[in-house]
Amino acid sequence: MSVPKAKALLTVCAALLLCGCGQALSEREIVRAVFFARQQGAYSACLLLADQNTESDGVQYKTASARGDTAAQALHLAEDALPGRLYYGLLDLAALPPGCDWADAQTLGTLLYDKAQPAPELSVFVLDTADHSWAADAASLYEDMKAVEREYDLHCGLQQLFTQTDGCAVPAYRADSGYDFALLAADGASVYVSGLQAQLAAALCGQTDRFFTAFAGGQAVCDTRVNVTAEDTTVQLHLRDTDFQPLGAYNEDWQALLCTELQQAFSALTADDAADFFHLQFWHVNLWGPGSALPVPRLEILFE
């Protein structure tokens, strides 16, 4: 086969793949987000879809939702409620149910992966505990979560649910500002943290490179770029272009106060060894071999 013909064939194959073997995207149900919740012992699943039949300007959405004994059943029933064939290729957000644990994350992550693999742009959050109406709230939840990602340079991909066998870490949505962070251990209790501690956990997990949070009891806001390196169990936190914004007539050593809070947050995050969320045990074993005693993790803060 000649090179031009081979290129033409590849182009046709790619077009058929994107269009669903000849069916145009305009004729399909395009899924943008999937939300899960648990209600009275059952699962609820909501599909947020692009509404291609509206004549309004801008992006418009519609929803399909259902309840089931399992998450898979609820999702399948929501899919069956739609007249067209579903297209998951543009799915870029999934929300796990509030209060979920590691087993839930694995089950739902596998279900989503089967639908949307490899889904490189798919982001994962844990939903908040508010009582949401899917029809009324799904679109705003989607827009809010994507806005949090942009503002805080935050991203937890679907694949991050499966990178460790002892736990996973996922940002948790909150309606007011910022985000919480869920540490879901396979053999321990799930831990949810907020504020500076949540953003430090996200940085240690490689899910953000920015701190933008209040500290010192709400007296100031810190905005800084973050990079994390490690030498054995010593974690080096590199802070660049750091800006402190006092929220009142305060005259404090903001750098010292931030360092104190970061050290306290780090100690709290690393006190529970139910799972190696920050890969400290992994790197120590790689350096010193299995069975070597793990030193107490230490945080070194470097302003650059």
What spans do the regions from the language model cover?
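Residue-level signal for mature regions of secreted extracellular proteins and peptides
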Residues: 14-15
